[in-house]
Structure formats: C-alpha cells, structure tokens
Amino acid sequence: AAAPSPNDKETKQKLTDLGVQRAKQWGWVNTYTYTKSLGEQLIAMEPGLRYTIVRPAIVEAALDYPFPGWVEGGRTAAPLVMMAMQGLRHWPVREDAPMEVVPVDQVAGAIILAGALLLHHEAAPVYHLATADRNPVSYGQIIRWINAEYLKDNRKIKLLTPGVVVMTPEVARSRGQLVSRKLTGIYEFLTEVRQFAQKNKLPFAKRLTKLGNNIRMITRQLSIREAALELYQPFLYDNRFIFESENIRTAHARLSEEEQRKLPWWPERIRWRHYWTVNELRGIQKWVEGESTKAYSFKL
C-alpha cells in the first residue's frame, strides 16, 4: 500500500497530535516552543560552532524606532487586541499573570549587541529578551486598558455593560457552548419561519434570509474566538511566565551612553498603559487590522 501523503488531512491531524504529545512530554506548552527548543539543541550540539541564542518574548509594536507603533503583520497579541477592541468582555485569564511582551525595536538592538559580542568571543550562551522580571504588566491590566479605549469609542455601550469579566477557561467554555446552542436554536427557528414565508410568498421572507445569514456569521465568529482563546490558554491562564533577562542587561551596561542610545534596552522605562493604548493598539489598527477583520464581532 502507498504511504500516506503528509498533505492528507487525516495524516496532518495525526502529526499535529503527535507533536502536541511530544511537546507536553518534555514540558513545552505547544509544538511551536517545542520545535524552537529542538533547533537550539541542534545548534548547541554542533562541534566547534561559536554561537549565542537570543530568545525574545512576544515581539510587538515599536516603542520608538522607526516610529512609535510600527508593527508588521499580525503579531501574537494582535488577535487579543482586536477581540478587546471589538467588545469582548469575558476573558479566561489569570489577572496577575504577566504578559511577557517586548517592543520590536528593543529586540533589534539587543540582537545587534549579542551579535557584536559573539564576534568578540564574549557572548553569553543565551540572552532572554523579556520585560516582566523588571517591569511586569498583567493580562488583567491590559484587557481593562483596551476595554476602556473601546468604551471611549462606544459611549452608549458603556451605559449598558459592567465592563470586563474575568473567568476560568472552564466557565468560558461552558458559556461559549451555551451561547452557541442558543444561536443554533435561533437560526433553526428563523429557517422554519423563512421557509413558511417563502412558501406563502410573504413580504418579509428576504429580511429573514438576511437575519439568518447574520446569525450564521455570528456563530462562526464565536467559533473562531473560542478556538483562539483555547490556543492562548497556556499563556493566559495555565502558566505564569517570567523570563530572567540579566544577561542582556549586563551586556547593555558595557556600552557607552552614546551606544546605549543607538541600541536601546530599557524595559524598565516603558510606560505600559501608554504603550498598549497608543503604540500597540493604534499600531495594530493602522498596520494590521484589515477591512475583513473589521466586520467581525467578538462582543459575545
């Protein structure tokens, strides 16, 4: 019999499941972090190879360079920011868990610095590029800051909603399933009424068709949102990651003041509320959020 194609849907799923199983076996939260660790081990095993490994946390919008808020592509936090800015209030997060985020321009400067030290045979084996060990910001703070920005743009909603609600993943899943069942019931009812209206040539049949399509779209959006939050659960709720970044601080301290200005590494100076509501939020809205995503609603 012919070997199964790696592009076959069933084979892809089996490979994905195997990757997740192996990742968890070795203590990694997903296959992404697991495969990165494999790459690092291959580098470390190479005889005679001089190397340094740079491990940035979640890389997001620029702090200053090339200008505040510059971001290319939908980075890791972009879906979460867009959910918050489109009205999502119910979040399965640990309030006190820090979000390990580092601006892209700080990462770029640190990589150049690590490379220069490697050329001089003075680099450490590993450089963590993170912020929470000196200047932590929690998920609870971030989602409330962004929700406040959302309410500024939607003042009528502010009068009707109690704000952000934090819950466990189990409660969030149960709530999502309940909403999904209700939407399915509404859609099935509308379908029956629409079919009756069409059969009897009633004037509101077209409006029922449009309403039914809207319900289907909302149900699909709910499914996408639930899948995204499930993907982020190891970071939002299951773990409390803080990465020690002493090596890059020590390296940066060796530079002159002029060199430090050219290659900045100052996480402790970041004003997080301003960063998230101006640099990150406005950067995503300007450079990432396309017309297709603006049609999606995450208010449920």
What label would you give each PLM region?
Residues W26-Y32, V93-E100, A130, E230-N239, ...:
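Active-site rim elements
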Residues A2-K24, Y65-V71, A77-E95, V101:
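Catalytic cores of eukaryotic secretory-pathway lumenal/extracellular enzymes that build
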Residues A1-G27, E259-I284, V288:
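First extracellular/luminal loop
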